[in-house]
Amino acid sequence: MADDAMTARFEREVLRHLDAAYNLARWLTGENAAAEDAVQEACLRAFRFFDGQRGESPKAWFMTIVRNTCLDGLKASRSAHHEEYDDEIHGATLHDGHDVAAVRDSDARSLHACIAGLPREYREVIVLRELEELAYKEIGAIVGVPLGTVMSRLARARDLLQRRLLAQHRRRAP
C-alpha cells in the first residue's frame, strides 16, 4: 500500500512536469531522441530517490535531475550539436494571415537559432526563466549556482540574444 501511495505522490508531484523536463532536455541536448532518453532516465532516477526528496520544490528537484542527466549524456557522447529550428519540434504553427505567419515564423526561427547558439550555461538559464518561467531561486537550485550567478548569466544571455537578433535583422534588412 505504501508503494501505491508513493507512486501516486510521484505522479502528482513530479510527472506533471514532464513537458518542462522535455523542453529543458531538448534545449540542452539539441536532439529529440537524446532529450527523450534523458527525460526517461531522469524519471527513473527521480523515482528511485523520490522517498528521500524533502523540502525543495518537486519541480526544481526533478529539473535538476533532468539537467544532470543531460549533462552526463553530453559528456559521455562528446557530440553535442544543434539542429536547425523545426516546426514539428518547437510547435510553431501559425494560422493567421500568410504574410504575418511568414514574418512570425522567420522571427521564431531566428530566436530559436540564437538560443540554440548560446553557450550551455546561458542557454539553460534563459530556457528555465523565459520558457519555463521558473523563479531565479529555483533556477539556482537546478543549475547549482548562487542567485547572483543566475542573475548575471541571465543578463549576459539576454544581451547576447539581443545582439545576435539585431545582427540577423540587419543582415536581412533590404
Where are the regions a protein language model picked out?
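Structural recognition of an alpha-helix C-terminal capping motif at a helix-to-coil junction
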Residues: 37-44, 48, 56-68
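Acidic, proline/glycine-rich intrinsically disordered inter-domain spacer in sigma factors
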Residues: 12, 80, 88-116
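C-terminal edge and immediately downstream basic/flexible tail or linker adjoining helix-turn-helix-like DNA-binding
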Residues: 1-10, 104, 137, 141-144, ...
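A short, charge-rich alpha-helical start-of-domain segment used by transcription regulators
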Residues: 1-23, 33-36
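Helix-turn-helix DNA-binding motif, specifically the short coil turn and the N-cap/start of the second
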Residues: 31, 135, 144-149
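Arg/Lys-rich amphipathic alpha helix in sigma70-family domain 2
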Residues: 64-85, 104, 166-167
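Residue-level preference for hydrophobic side chains embedded in well-ordered alpha helices
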Residues: 13, 17, 21, 42, ...
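A short pre-motif secondary-structure segment
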Residues: 125-129
